[in-house]
Structures are given as structure tokens and as C-alpha cells.
Amino acid sequence: MSRARISNYRKGVAAVALSAALAGAFVVTGPLGALNEARAEAVHVTPPPQAGFADLVEKVRPAVVSVRVKKDVQETSNRGPQFFGPPGFDQLPDGHPLKRFFRDFGMEPRGDSRSDNRRGKANKPRPGHERPVAQGSGFVISEDGYVVTNNHVVSDGDAYTVVLDDGTELDAKLIGADPRTDLAVLKINAPKRKFVYVAFGDDNKVRVGDWVVAVGNPFGLGGTVTSGIVSARGRDIGAGPYDDFIQIDAAVNKGNSGGPAFDLSGEVIGINTAIFSPSGGSVGIAFAIPSSTAKQVVDQLIKKGSVERGWIGVQIQPVTKDIAASLGLAEEKGAIVASPQDDGPAAKAGIKAGDVITAVNGETVQDPRDLARKVANIAPGEKAALTVWRKNKAEEINVTIAAMPNDKGKSGSQSNDNDGGQGETLDSYGLTVVPSEDGKGVVVTDVDPDSDAADRGIRSGDVIVSVNNQTVKTAGDINKAITAAEKSGRKAVLLQLQSNDQSRFVALPINQE
């Protein structure tokens, strides 16, 4: 074949190949367009096996109840001005739903203008009757109808009604209440009925970030379910000496008090008790009593109707950074004994003012609140080994736990009539002091408002009893104690103060110039 023919043959083949390629391109374009149209269809996602809490709620909800509380009201008369009812109440027509609502709750208009005929017997003194005063939530913990709720829900009541999830209303009686932990137990009056109930779980296994489900009766609406997570542990909200709340962000509102917070196993890990809210509604900050605390209290309330706690009889305060430095402690942990109560268990065992209790039965004490809880959980009559820090070393003291006595309010303050004369000035601390009349310590007569002493709350009239656990009677004794502390390398000195029959410790930094 000549070169010319070969060249023409190659050109022909190339042309055919190009035509085929173009044809193929058009063939492929059709299906690609169809694929694009398929991709425009709605996306369908298969849900995970556990998409919600419906199964859990279905099982636990029958055990959650609403609690209605009523109180006996003394004889009243409808004549004259009334103190209940909103402005404009008397302008509402008879039969108006709001008027019926307020009257159902014992509220009457200010100056009811109805005629005597329309009042019927209402113009006569009404006999004592029960008026609703509170409502909250609770949950059944036994087949025979024991119900756990909050003390603040039932504390003002004389009669109690429990409303089950199906709407059944049953009378109940108060078995016992514990204001210190804000817990109470009711017993439903239905001896032949077997109730669905829930169990307490172990809140010590609950971690921050775990799911929780809250069930309750917000605003009296009836069984309502919300969910959230554990936001924090060990919260102290100033409600009492045993504060140790679990913080959750599930929606909790008024009326949820006493209701349960469940883990995903359907066990109660907390009792919803309080919320933090500037508006009165839920802002995602709720507090629940841990189940470990509740179980101990509830068991005692059912058995005895009251709670008996361990007690050692000490006034305690936190170990601050300055106090730790003044005592040679490596950590700001424990509780310093401001004063042991005369003839109390601690005093009898040899616990002294200035001792720092760092452990109970080998368990570290974090702070005064932790010490109070640990001691309270020990049965009266048992012995407890307290580890105390005294004179730069730890030692163990056995204390026989007693039952906590009933609170006795301390009356009035005690004034100090010592005019102090001229007094001596401790220039480095901005204090002027004079010896006390009974020879026990020195009395502070003046405090420089710009001094460290003023910043730490020392005031005129306070009595300095000791410095670094050394008794003092003069300003010279104080200076000697400060000098000794400085030579030993301490950065602060510990003052024991007495005021209004109360003892406390204050650490002042040593001014090293």
C-alpha cells in the first residue's frame, strides 16, 4: 500500500473513532441527567434503635403522682372587706370560670356586693373548712403505696390527696417529714390496692453529661415529661447543712417539686426540689436531691416517722488558703474546729478548738459540709475515728457519735461594755486592743478600715482568745506569737476570735518587709 493510501486510511479511522466518541458522549449524557434528577428526591434516613424515651416513660409514669395539699381554715364571714381575689374580681359575672376558680381556692372578692338573698347562707359564719394551699409531685416507692415528695410541699397541710396518672384521686396521710433534707413520705389510704412503683438507683454512678428524665406536675397540669442531662454534681444552694444537689437542665417548674428524675434504666437518681430562675420559670437550672441521701432519710421516716442523725457537737468553719498556710497544711481541705460544745461528744473525746478534722473513718473531709454529712450518716452510739491536724502533725481520735439534739435557737447578741481605755496598737495589723476584764484574751477596740484585719471581718468588740493556738492576754503575747510564727517560716498567723458567744478563726498574713 502506498504512503498516500495509508495516510488516507488513518484519517478515515480517526474520523470514525471521533464520531463514535461523540455518539458515546451523547449516549452517556442521557443517563447522567436521569441520575441528577434522582438525587433531587427527598432524603430518607433510618432512625437509630433508641430514638426517644417513650418506652422508659411508659413504664415509670404510672408510679408518678400529683400531690394536693389542703389546710383547715378557721371560721370566716363573707361580710366586710376580703383580702383574697385579684383586682376586678368582683366585676366578673357570676358563673365566670375565673370566679369559680378563685372561689374553689377559698378566695373571695374584695367587698362582695351580692345581696343577702343571692348569698343564701353565705352571710352566716362559715364553719371551718379545708382550703388548697399547695400542690406538687411525688412518686410511689412500694406496692402498698408509700409516696416520696418534698417537705416544703406538705409542710403547711392538714389533709393530703394523691392523684394517680390515670386521674384516680386517693386520700393519703403524712408518715414523716425531714426539713433538713426537704423530704417527706406519704402513705396512700388504699389497703387492698397494689400500686406500680419505682426504685431508687445509685446516683454515685451518675456522671455529668448523662441523660435524665423528669416527670411531674408543673403548674398543676398533671403528668408532664421533660428530659435533659446532668449538668453538675455536689451543688450547694444554701438550702441547708446537707446540700449536695445534682444539677440538671431538664425543664423543671413550680409543681415539679417532689417529682423524680430518672436515669435511662428507669431508676430514681434524684428528687426534683428547686430551680434557679430570675423569672420564676425554667431556665434550665434545676436541683435534685441525690437518691443516696433520699433513700437513707426515707427508710428512717417509714420506720420511725423521723430522722435520727449522728452528731459530735462542734462549731466548724472552712479551711481557707490563709488558714492552711498558718497551720502548715498542704491542702485547703478539712474543717477547722472553732469551738467544741461543752460536754459534747467531741469535747469528751479530746477535740480542741483549732484542730482541723481531715478525715472520718479514713474518708477525706473536703469541707465543713462534707464533715456534717459524714457524721450525720453514722448511727448514734457508734464510734468514729476522726483524723485531726494538731501541732503540725496528724493524729487519730475516737469519738462516740451521739444523736443530734433538737435545734435550740440562739438568742440575741451579747454586747461588750469594755471601753478599753487607751489600748495598745498592733501597727502591722491595724488593730488596737486592751486586755479583757476576765483575763481571757484581748478585746479589739479599733480596726483600721484599710487593714487586712478589716478585710477579713475583724470588728471592734471581738475578743482575740489565741494566736496560733497559744492563749494571749496582752498585745505583747500577740506580738510574741507572731514573731515565733515568722521565725518558723509561716506566711500567716491564726487568730481565734470570740464574739456574741460564737468562736471563729481568722488567718492574717504576716507582713514581711
From Swiss-Prot:
Its main location: periplasm. Residues 1-25 form the signal peptide. Substrate binds at G255, N256, S257, I312, G313, V314, Q315, I316. Might be efficient in the degradation of transiently denatured and unfolded proteins which accumulate in the periplasm following stress conditions. It is an enzyme of class 3 (hydrolase). Keywords: Hydrolase, Periplasm, Protease, Repeat, Serine protease, Signal, Stress response. It is found in: Periplasm. Residues 300-391, 414-500 form the PDZ domain. This is Probable periplasmic serine endoprotease DegP-like. Its EC number is 3.4.21.107. The active site is at H152, D182, S257. The keyword Protease applies. It comes from Brucella abortus (strain 2308). Residues 101-119 have a biased composition (Basic and acidic residues). Residues 125-299 are annotated as: Serine protease. The keyword Signal applies.
